[in-house]
Amino acid sequence: MLARCLSASLQGLEARPVVVEVDLAPGLPGVQLVGLPDKAIQESRERVRSALRNSGFRGPLVRVVINLAPADLRKEGPSFDLPIALALLVASGQLARPQLEGLWCAGELGLDGSLRPCRGVIALAAKAQQHKAQALVVPPENAQEASLIEGLTIRTAANLRTLVEHAQRPSTVARGAHHCRSQRPGQRRSKRRGGSELLPLH
């Protein structure tokens, strides 16, 4: 099964859109990562594998091909951990495909499934807003800077398990998950006072 998740790669001061594609196919278990990934991204195979297992999800027992498109764009950094993990969950049937529609995300994963901050979030948020993303998912430490981009819904959670559980139960606000809408006219004052709007994950 093929699944996709949207993210971006920082190129200087600008973020370039990247489609993370994950395909599961019959064959000897293994993970092949293509699309000009740097060393940090190549190592994401082990981080994601451990994060999935320690978060209570099934790891793939088939051949996995992960493609970062476009193939001619050099990608750097561990921020692709989260989109790879989410696409893997969809491809393996552990997360519904509609949960990723219109969603952009970035973040490093700890081996325990925790979401860790990444670089270039403001540029990524600006690009996501430009492409009319439904929402951007980032680690908690990046949520404040991402919210500087107006007109974009920002979602965050402490760990992968919380994020997925919230996605599967959109009518409830999972403990430890926070969702805020970027500043809009009339909201700037409440934002500066620390106010945030809780939103369900669609």
Residue ranges and their predicted role:
Residues M1-H202:
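Peripheral, non-AAA+ core regions of ATP-driven protein-machinery
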